[in-house]
């Protein structure tokens, strides 16, 4: 998907040299072959262009870049791991890309305070590992955790599979360091859980997708590392039964239920067929599956999980289930889940939605959306899966078997209209955790409160009066 709108003025060689002097020749990328990985995302859906990619190694260098960009009115696109799914990290109009990947230092870990301060280019998986080294847990977990960065996670307010128990990225950030459009540095790297000294500026930048400033560091909340983690893969008949199992799990497990993923059979089938080394956890076929996990500081997690599954069997909710016998099997369950998005690619065109509805409405949403999409495009294959525990469903639709991918993807907005109408009628959101970017930018004013949009525009004008920070994204 190429975005044609407001092309940027080409950079002069003299201006490129001034930017290059800030980061050093080694970290200023201009050769087209070297720039290429920064201007396209892994699905090939968005393709941009940029004359220059800057890879600063410090907050001071980021500030110098922003000062020069403001002085010369040069647009910037902040980019972390380039794993975003809505085109927010792509330079669509020839902007300068500011890659944060070299901002990769862990500045401080304080297990007594349960905090970690790290730079925005730290890969999520590294942050998890560093927390584990001091017997702590950083619970944000995503399929892209091996390549996505903390800055990107915060800029999109990522959710992930642990949001049921620990919340989304916003709730894991205690403080931020942010470079503003004019190069000023906001130092709000507080480790405090209680701080009522004025406006909460931190939350302006979380979920703003780099349109208000560039996050360069964050103070993150850590949690005690669980002593026991137990995981089950469950086969059942319907999302309604999954909802009943969720209710049982929440009653029996209290706060130890950390993940509860709903998976359609077609999503599981795609992962098994197209993933590397992935096997179906259950021998029989089932219309729906649940991947659930309990984490506890005590040793009774397995007993609790088995009791939940036993109640599900007694009530006719659970048809079959397997509890992971070891870490390897647990990882295999999660690999199947994590590969679901990538496994849709070999099936042709895929129209993706990241929606949320009230938890109780999930079964009705899936049933109504499936019927509406198939009516619109006969043969289309809905592939719903996601976080039932918080109502966030990745409602993806694969093209009909044997269909033409380009023709199918050309109907993206038609499918959006059908799906979003149902979402909004049920009191939901068109973007649960992936952000707005350019993919949902044009729909945002239609679904967001008008006063909220006005306030967002006012904040953007105040913090970025020249509009140089990730232009054309979100608003």
Residue ranges and their predicted role:
Residues 1-475:
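Noncatalytic alpha-helical scaffold of FAD-dependent oxidoreductases
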